[in-house]
Amino acid sequence: MIGIVVSRADGASTHIWAQLREIEDFERIGPDAYRADGIEVRVFEELHTTIDDAADAFEAAVDMVVVVSRHSGDTGPLLSAHYTGNFGAAEYGGADRSVAPACPNAHHAVVDSLRSYAPPEYDVAMECTHHGPTSVGAPSMFVELGSSPAEWQDDAGARAVARAVRDLRGVPPHGDRAVVVFGGGHYTPRATRILADTDWPVGHVAADWSLTELGRPNAHRGVVDAMFTASGAAHALVEGDRPELTETIRDLGYTVVSETWVRETDGVPLSRVAALEESLTTVDDGLRFGEPAATHTGGYLVVELPDAVLDAAHAVDTAATVAAGRSHALAVTTVNAGRRLAGSAAFPDADAYEAFVDDVAAVLNAEYASVSRADGELTATREVFDPEAAAALGVPEGPAFGRLAGGEAIEHDGRTIAPAAVTSTETVRADVALHERPRERVRRPSDDEGKGN
């Protein structure tokens, strides 16, 4: 059951409520109480930032409380969602240095819906944690229509918020993962990107100004810890260089990760992430997950990759070579920020490794005249320009040399030199048999400094 809070002191709140009644049939169950399938609405006179223990006002037990509200700012038309809490003194409701229970899974869903329903002129963003209330009685969030009186009375904007909130029926407040964010601007571009691009829900966010209000992280460890516990999170993104904050987070038993780590673990079970990082290397050191990682549930083989063949394939088509690895492997080790395969990989089974080698051979086929596999060996041959042969025929470096290298016949010293006269056979021959590598434990920062989620 979703509990929706409406405030008569907020014109945008009542306008969203009016739009919600247009798209959903509500039964009046009290003077200021209404119910529809999976939804209960309570209308309050006071401003919602000052309403404590709102969950107790509903007749039914609610799984979460959603406050529909205005957003004020110089941000133009904006639909947003955020959690509530104070990192310093409570100036606008709630308690000092306290955060309310968050609902990251539902928040991710509502931001996705806002993006789907937003009129063209509206932006969509997550805001950082701010203002009250901090005592709600259930996981909660504000979903807002902004940012000026014109938008507060805009039917299209209000209807978009109403539809997004209605879509929360049946959506649990929490999932199996969440990340909290420290640092950045009030409108949290990093968190908004993560919500748009990955399956990671975002919990509480402490913006730069919030951390200024917080003061020394080690002196307010309880607030830092509460961000995680209230979000059901064990991972954190830290914007910028904040050594004391990072140390405090790790001392509390949580794990600081990079945005790359969050993006690369999108859709991959965290137990699988931990196992593969332990068997191969860390994401920050080049581990990249393949398509099977999202659904594979069995064991896996750690295999040494055939470097000589990969070097040749990368020279033909780097992207296709990497795609071959990520299509068949649970995870691959890479260099150059994930743009080249190197080292080893984890495959679900021997058949997956063989399919990978077949795909790499197909990459070579694009530029090699012959590619064959026999007895665990791959052989690829092609005719290539031989600069030494051209020099031996007296062709100096320059435009004519370049045309000859490009496969064009040239006239030199009164004779025609055909490309075939300056070619040699290049052969790539390498062992591509499956060589399983003993698994070695890879130390991760979380081994001594944090815990997995």
Swiss-Prot record:
| InterPro entries associated with the record | Deacylase_DtdA_archaea, DtdA
GO molecular function terms listed in the Swiss-Prot or TrEMBL record: D-aminoacyl-tRNA deacylase activity; zinc ion binding
Keywords, alphabetical: Hydrolase, Metal-binding, Zinc
| EC id | 3.1.1.96
Q: Give yes or no: UniProt keyword Hydrolase.
A: yes
Give the required cofactors.
Zn(2+)
Stored Pfam families: tRNA_deacylase (PF04414)
| Cofactor binding notes | Binds 2 Zn(2+) ions per subunit.
Which PANTHER family would you find in this protein's record?
A: D-AMINOACYL-TRNA DEACYLASE (PTHR34667:SF1)
For this chain, the family text in UniProt reads: Belongs to the DtdA deacylase family.
Give the record's subunit note: Monomer.
Protein's UniProt name: D-aminoacyl-tRNA deacylase
Tell me what organism the protein belongs to: Halobacterium salinarum (strain ATCC 700922 / JCM 11081 / NRC-1) (Halobacterium halobium)
Lineage, broadest ranks: Archaea, Methanobacteriati, Methanobacteriota, Stenosarchaea group, Halobacteria
